[in-house]
Structures are given as C-alpha cells and as structure tokens.
Design a protein with these regions (language model features):
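Short, charge-dense linear interaction motifs
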Residues: 1-108, 112-206
Length: 206
C-alpha cells in the first residue's frame, strides 16, 4: 500500500535581505560617478551605524552608461546624460529594526530599495518537526485504509520525500499575526513562513 502525507510548520521569519541602491545622473561621467560614490559611502556608513555589520553589506551591482536626451518631439538633442547605479545587498538580523534601517538608508542618500526577502536563519528543528508530522499523517491514512479494507498493515517498506521542503511566505497582513514595524519608520510586514514536507510511504499488507 502506498500513501502520502503532508506536514506543515508555521514560523515567524527572523532575518531579512534587502537591496539598497543609489542612482545618480550627470552630464559628465566622472562627476556622476563621484556623486554616486559619495552617496553610496554615506549610505554604507549610516547602515553600519545602525548595527548592520560590515560583513552583512555586499556590493552587488555597479553600472554606468550614457543615455541620449530627446526633445518634446522625441528627437535626439545631441546631449548625453550619464547614468550611474550602485547597489548593496544587506542582511538585517533584527526584524524589529528593518523599518528604521530603511529610513536611515534613504536619509543618507539611497533612492532605490527593492527585493525585500524574509527568511528563517535556522529551520532545521522546524524541518524535522514537519517531517515527523508528514510521516504521522501518512501513517494515519494507511491505518484508515487498512481498516476500511479489512487488511492488516505491515511494516514500512520505503519512505520518500517529494515536493521539497523550501520555506514559503504566507502573508497575513496587518493585524493578522504578522510582525509590523510602523511608528516613525517605514511600515514593513514580515508575514509568516511555512515549511512544508510531503512524503510517500509504502507499507506491507498482511
């Protein structure tokens, strides 16, 4: 007999990843780069003062490219503007401070924030619990089927997992159990994460 079982464990995220960027423009490439460098350095220093460790700040993108300017009729003016982008990827280990961290970054010169991702720093215990629940769920189904069919359930012959055990977010929204940081900071909701495990179990029938 082959049955499947599912186990789910709901957790509150305790870590976040955010991409913070500085975008500058200028008619002179070196000037645009210099301005961007100054703003980016100010952002990094502000983040470090907000208890973001230096090892949790990583530059992920730096780009500079020319952009043609156009007039009201859509015709090129011959003027060139240089676009400079610099992005850093940060890890926030205190979710209660994430709103303040974003505020600090913006006040220091950041003008691009994207890709806020929440995660669980240590999900091993939750994964083990979800696996136990999945096996117990499969066991219960097998016992019910055996009883309904007047069969005797034997030993487990094989257990396999499928569907993965990747945590995924479940947004409950404000007031629905989600961690929300408001006050004077940017309001950010971490929601909840669900670790889901599915198993397939083969039983001997006697």
């Amino acid at each position: 007999m082959t049955v499947s079982g599912t186990g789910k464990v709901t957790l509150t995220p305790d870590i976040a990843y955010v991409t913070i960027g500085v975008h500058t423009e200028g008619k002179d490439a070196s000037q645009a780069v210099s301005e961007n460098n100054s703003q980016t350095q100010a952002v990094i220093e502000a983040l470090e003062k907000s208890d973001i460790a230096s090892e949790d700040i990583q530059t992920t993108n730096f780009s500079i490219y020319p952009q043609q300017q156009f007039d009201d009729r859509g015709q090129p003016t011959g003027e060139i503007t240089y676009i400079v982008n610099n992005s850093v990827y940060i890890t926030v280990r205190d979710l209660e401070s994430i709103g303040d961290v974003l505020n600090v970054a913006v006040e220091a010169g950041a003008n691009q924030i994207s890709g806020i991702q929440f995660d669980i720093s240590d999900a091993e215990d939750a994964l083990a619990e979800a696996q136990e629940m999945a096996v117990a769920n499969a066991q219960a189904q097998a016992e019910n089927l055996a009883q309904a069919s007047n069969l005797v359930l034997g030993d487990i012959q094989n257990i396999s997992t499928f569907g993965g055990a990747t945590p995924y977010l479940k947004y409950d929204g404000i007031g629905g159990g989600a961690a929300v940081m408001e006050a004077a900071s940017v309001p950010v909701s971490s929601g909840q994460m669900i670790i889901s495990v599915e198993v397939s179990v083969i039983y001997e029938i006697r």
